[in-house]
Amino acid sequence: MVHQYQLNGYNIVLDTCSGSVHVVDDVAYDVIAMYQDHTADQIVSAMMDKYGSRPDVTEEDLRQCIDDVTSLKEAGKLWSPDVYENMAFDFKNRSTVVKALCLHVAHTCNLSCSYCFASQGRYHGDRALMSFEVGKRAMDFLIENSGTRRNLEVDFFGGEPLMNFDMVKKLVAYCREQEKIHNKNFRFTMTTNGVLIDDDVIDFCNKECHNVVLSLDGRKEVNDRFRKDYAGRGSYDTIVPKFQEFVKKRGDKNYYMRGTYTHYNTDFTNDIFHMADLGFTELSMEPVVSKPGDPSALTAEDLPILKEQYEILAKEMIKRDREGRGFTFYHYMIDLTGGPCISTRISGCGSGTEYMAVTPWGDLYPCHQFVGDPKYLMGDIWKGVTNTAVRDEFKHCNAYARKECKDCWAKLYCSGGCAANSYHATGSITGVYEYGCELFKKRMECAIMIKVAENQELAAQGIEVPIELGSTCNACADGEACE
C-alpha cells in the first residue's frame, strides 16, 4: 500500500508495510500515482501531455523514471506486500505479562475541570485516596505478573496524585527495596495539575520519576476556561511559575507539558507556541473527547481548521528549530529508522493485557478511561484477572481487528487507534473513532514531513539517512522481548 501527499513543498510517497519514505519531484510523483493501474505507454502519454513543454522531460526520461519505480517495487520499497496480518491473530495465544500499571492513588482532585473525563477525579464514584497497603499489593501484583521482564512502568495518576503524596513517597521507597530482591527496574511517571508542587515535590520527582506530565492548556484565558478550582478561580497564575521552576531544576530529565484543546480553542497552535515561549520545550496537546452536544466537543466544522493547525505547527517547528529555539511535540516524535518493532506497531499500547489501571480499592481495569465501567472490571490485585473475557477481548484489539483499517495507510502507526476512544465513540473497542482517525492521519503526515525536512538539511551537508522501517525498537534495545 502506498500513500502520497504534498505538504510544505514536498512530494512525499510512503510505503506502508516497509515504512519507506520517498521524496520525489512532480513528474515522479505523478508517475507513481499512475503506475499500478496503467501501462508504461499510457503513463508516458499522460506525462508528455502534462509536462511535454518542459525541456527537461523527455520520453526517455519518463521511461527511466518508470524503470526506477519498478526497481523500488521489486526491492520492497513501494507496494510491499502486507506480511503482518497473520501476526495479529497470534496475539490471542500470547502469554500475558504485565509490564505497566496506571496507579490511581487519588480519586479526588483540587481542581474542577469541567471537561474532565474522570468527573473531577472521582470517576463517577466516591472520592478516595489509595492506602499504602493497596499500593504495596499493587506493586507486588506487578512484580508477580511481570515474568522475566525487568523494566516495569508505574504512572501515579488521579484525580490529583499529589493529594496522596506521602503514600507515593512511601510506595516508591518500597519499590526500590523490591528492585534488588527481584531484579526489577521501576520507572515512575507522575501526572499532576501542579497546584501542590513545592520544593519537596520537585526534589522527589527529579530523583525518582523517569517522566513527569504537567497539565497546562496554554494561554491564560484558555487554561482558565476549564482548569478552575472549586471556587471558580483559574489555575494559570498558580501553576505556571511552579512548572517553570520544576522544569528549570529538572535539567535534562524527561517531562511533558500536556494540554487539552476543545471547540473553544481550535487555534490550539497558539497555545503550544505560548507554552514554548514560556520556556517549555517538551510539549503535548490532545483533542478533547466529549459527548456529542457538549459545548466543548469538537465539531465536524472544526475538523478542517484543526488539520490546518497541525500543518501550521509543523512548519513553525521547522522554522524555530533552524533558529535554535526548537521544541518537541509529542505526536510528531516518530523514529522512521529504529522505531517500534512490528509486534508493537500491530498491538499498540497493550491496555487490558500488558497494561492495566488500579483503583484506590485495588480493582483492575484495562486502562484509566475504563475505570468505573462495571462491564470492564477485570478483577483485583489480590485475585488477579478473573474476568478473562475482557482480557481476551483486548488481546484481539489491534491494527487488523477493524475491517475499516484494512486499507488504511496509517494502520501500522496508530495500531488500530485508542480502544477507549473507540468504545466511547461507537460502543465497541474495535469500533472506529473516525474523527480521531482523521486527526491522527494528519499528525502523521506532518510528522513525516518534519523528518523529510530534517533529512533534506542533512543531505545538504553530505549526510545521507535512509528513511525506512528499522528492525528493532527501544524495548528490544533495552534487552526486553517485544513479543
Residue ranges and their predicted role:
Residues H38-G52:
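Short acidic, hydrophobic short linear motifs in intrinsically disordered regions
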Residues D56-D203, K207-E208:
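Conserved alpha-helical substructure of the radical SAM core
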Residues T108-A118, P366-Q369, K403-A420, N474-A481:
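Local cysteine-cluster metal-coordination motifs and their immediate loop/turn environment
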Residues G135, M139-D155, N164-V288:
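Radical SAM/AdoMet-radical enzyme domain recognition
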Residues I305-G338, H368-S415:
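C-terminal accessory region of radical SAM enzymes
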Residues M139-F157, F394-H396, V432-C476:
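Short Fe-S-cluster ligation motifs
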Residues R63, E221-D237, Q244, K248-S351, ...:
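Radical SAM enzyme [4Fe-4S]-AdoMet core and its adjacent flexible, acidic
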Residues M1-Y35:
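Acidic, low-complexity/disordered tracts enriched in E/D and polar residues
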